[in-house]
Amino acid sequence: MNGLRVAAKIQPARQTIIFLHGLGDTGSGWGFLAQYLQQRDPAAFQHTNFVFPNAPELHVTANGGALMPAWFDILEWDPSFSKVDSDGFMNSLNSIEKTVKQEIDKGIKPEQIIIGGFSQGAALALATSVTLPWKIGGIVALSGFCSIPGILKQHKNGINVKTPIFHGHGDMDPVVPIGLGIKAKQFYQDSCEIQNYEFKVYKGMAHSTVPDELEDLASFIKKSLSS
């Protein structure tokens, strides 16, 4: 899986943050997160690798077949975001698992790995809480949702039920309405037995991020990697 990689400022690296972009974006679009965290708290993130993978180029059905970076095809713009390519979703999950394994093979402990994402990437990040074969340090979902609950229930392995999750969502999001974020939280808590799911609403925030959310994200990651 190609993309942007930012090596730890001080080697050897002890932690890794993997962050997955949204539809139509690339890993470089979230590369600012590495600099933000390193400047905000140099001591906490000086031994941290940052990995921003690129999604494959897909013809997105709901966008008239336009070719763009996408973790999975969206078959139709429906209010529930349920009409997606489930096989593509699972394929991307497998790719993320391989990325995690690459970090583990380099000597990073699973508990020192964070998986995060925005929008489509957040949907995948949340799904890793069900499917990953290792217990990781934490999961970050910005403007996330759940598209294939039935399939994910079949794959749940219980390994990350105690892994902390931070889900930030704007109450003015026109792309992934806040109701879908709430449904995702309910699904992962009720059907997947996730025990530590923090859902925070940001007033006035649309389908984007804001400084307050980034501050909360940074605090969550620091706490998760130091616990």
Swiss-Prot record:
Report the catalytic activity.
S-hexadecanoyl-L-cysteinyl-[protein] + H2O = L-cysteinyl-[protein] + hexadecanoate + H(+)
Q: Where in the cell is it found?
A: Cytoplasm; Nucleus
Which SUPFAM superfamilies would you find in this protein's record? alpha/beta-Hydrolases (SSF53474)
Give the primary localization class: cytoplasm
- Keywords from the UniProt entry: Cytoplasm, Fatty acid metabolism, Hydrolase, Lipid metabolism, Nucleus, Serine esterase
Please give an example of a GO cellular component term from this record: nucleus
GO BP annotations listed: fatty acid metabolic process
The highest taxon in the source lineage is Eukaryota
Catalytic residues? Answer: 119 (charge relay system), 173 (charge relay system), 207 (charge relay system)
Q: Any idea which GO molecular function terms this record carries?
A: carboxylic ester hydrolase activity; palmitoyl-(protein) hydrolase activity
Cysteine pairs forming cystine bridges in this chain are: none
Job description of the protein? Hydrolyzes fatty acids from S-acylated cysteine residues in proteins with a strong preference for palmitoylated G-alpha proteins over other acyl substrates. Mediates the deacylation of G-alpha proteins such as GPA1 in vivo, but has weak or no activity toward palmitoylated Ras proteins. Has weak lysophospholipase activity in vitro; however such activity may not exist in vivo.
Q: Which PANTHER family match?
A: LYSOPHOSPHOLIPASE-LIKE PROTEIN 1, LYSOPHOSPHOLIPASE-RELATED
Q: Which family does it belong to?
A: Belongs to the AB hydrolase superfamily. AB hydrolase 2 family.
Miscellaneous note of the record: Present with 1480 molecules/cell in log phase SD medium.
Instruction: Please give the name of this protein.
Output: Acyl-protein thioesterase 1
